[in-house]
Amino acid sequence: MAASAVTARYGTLHNTSMAVVSLGMIVVAIVHFLSNPANAPTLSLNDPRFALFLMLAMAMLYYVFQGVTRTLNREPQVVIDHDGIRLGFGRNKSFTWDDIVWVRLRRLALRPQLEIGLADQAFITANLRLSMWSFDDSLRPVRGQPTTLLVRDNGLDTKSSAMLDAVRSFRPNLVK
């Protein structure tokens, strides 16, 4: 029996909830200041409270945007099949099984994350534009392992353990 491909898309519930909660936080702050005008900051950048709430509102609007765009994006972000692993997340890079040296689960806080060790040349050629400072990116570098990337399943509809099981079904020799 041939193994079937596993795909992971952005989860609708998670990302819609993120957008709704972020928008709700902005609305609650506005309603609070409208009902308590004595506590409201003055509409001037010279008032540090206004500057703080403006920055917080911009951050929350960013998460509203992220939640809505991810909810509407139904493209697979991770595909594991007989050809290898394809990663989306705005990069759309494919790695054949020959490019992948090993795969394992790594615990990051409480959640397991899929860690993929790539061959040096495959990692360099892919130019994944990874950043340690991007908190929203589902692809992260692993400190101390230059050709390894971490696939975070936060906001995806498939858990990392299911992705590891898919790798195991196609190439059991790669699982650490």
Regions found by a protein language model. Give the residues of each.
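N-terminal membrane-targeting/pre-transmembrane regions
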Residues: 1-47, 165, 169, 175-176
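Pocket-edge structural micro-motifs
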Residues: 10, 89, 153
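Canonical hydrophobic alpha-helical transmembrane segment
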Residues: 22-25, 48-66
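Conserved beta-hairpin
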Residues: 61-104
